[in-house]
Design a protein with these regions (language model features):
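Conserved catalytic motifs of ABC-family nucleotide-binding domains
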Residues: 56
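Conserved catalytic loops of ABC-family nucleotide-binding domains
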Residues: 80-93
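Catalytic Walker B motif of ABC-type/P-loop ATPase nucleotide-binding domains
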Residues: 60-63
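Conserved ABC ATPase signature
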Residues: 35-45
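Conserved ABC ATPase "signature" region
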Residues: 5, 14-31
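Hydrophobic anchor residue at the start of the ABC signature
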Residues: 49
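Helix N-cap at the start of a conserved alpha-helix in ABC-type nucleotide-binding domains
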Residues: 71-73
Length: 130
């Protein structure tokens, strides 16, 4: 819980209930008393997302958000990002994983630091509930 509240501590605006809501939105409210080493890699990744959510961002930059996750946790993280997008946040995902890339509405391919091409597509898989 304190991990999620870190930004609040910096701004002297501690709100435990808001942090619990952020954890609930990523499916981890029941794990709020666990230390980081007591969480799986997927749970730790979702705590990072909850920490970002507490600031109510309109833009989220997710650098390899599913790196080193199993398929189940990868799907959970992608679904969380989809829900954030559907609620009005702009999500920019940086990834080398083509499986993750196909989830995007728009894909920008870079080669040697320059835009090589851009593709638009429709989302094909259903959203899972956390």
């Amino acid at each position: 819980l304190e991990n999620v509240m870190m930004a609040q501590y910096y701004h002297s605006m501690v709100d435990k209930e808001e942090a619990l809501q952020a954890l609930e939105s990523v499916g981890l409210k029941d794990r709020h008393n666990h230390l980081p080493n007591q969480l799986s890699g997927g749970e730790q990744q979702r705590v990072c997302i909850a920490r970002a959510l507490i600031n109510h961002p309109s833009l989220i930059l997710a650098d390899e958000p599913t790196g080193n996750l199993d398929e189940k946790n990868e799907m959970l993280v992608l679904d969380i990002l989809e829900r954030l997008h559907n609620s009005g946040s702009t999500i920019v995902v940086v990834t080398h994983d083509q499986e993750v890339g196909v989830e995007a509405e728009r894909i920008v391919f870079l080669e040697h630091g320059r835009i090589a091409r851009e593709e638009k597509q429709k989302r094909q898989r259903p959203v899972l509930e956390v």
